Amino acid sequence: RVLLTICLLLFPLSALPLDGDQPADQPARHMQSAERNPRFDPVKRCCPYPSCIDIPFCDCCG
């Protein structure tokens, strides 16, 4: 028991990453941006119609 107590004091359980702290659980910013889509039109500031269905952040789709 003493060894377990010492180990927990040196390495608390709160130091371990929890499920919500994993990078895979957090959405990637580059995947959400329409500007990073290769079909993005910088003049119109949107994507052509067929590809805007998959990209929720296109301004002129809809």
UniProtKB/Swiss-Prot annotation:
Q: Which residues carry this modification: Cysteine amide?
A: 61
Could you list this entry's UniProt keywords, alphabetically sorted: Amidation, Cleavage on pair of basic residues, Disulfide bond, Secreted, Signal, Toxin
- Which first-to-last residue range defines the signal peptide? 1-15
Respond yes or no to whether keyword Disulfide bond is given for this record.
yes
Positions of the propeptide removed during maturation: 16-45
Known InterPro entries for this protein?
A: Conotoxin (IPR004214)
* Segments for region (Disordered): 17-37
Identify the GO cellular component terms for this protein. Answer: extracellular region
Q: In which tissues is it expressed?
A: Expressed by the venom duct.
Disulphide bonds in the chain: 46-60, 47-58, 52-61
As for subcellular location, the record says: Secreted
Supply one GO molecular-function term: ion channel inhibitor activity
Q: Pfam families per the record?
A: Conotoxin
Entry domain remark: The cysteine framework is III (CC-C-C-CC).
Family that this chain belongs to: Belongs to the conotoxin M superfamily.
Entry protein name: Conotoxin reg3.7
Identify the taxonomic lineage of the organism of origin: Eukaryota, Metazoa, Spiralia, Lophotrochozoa, Mollusca
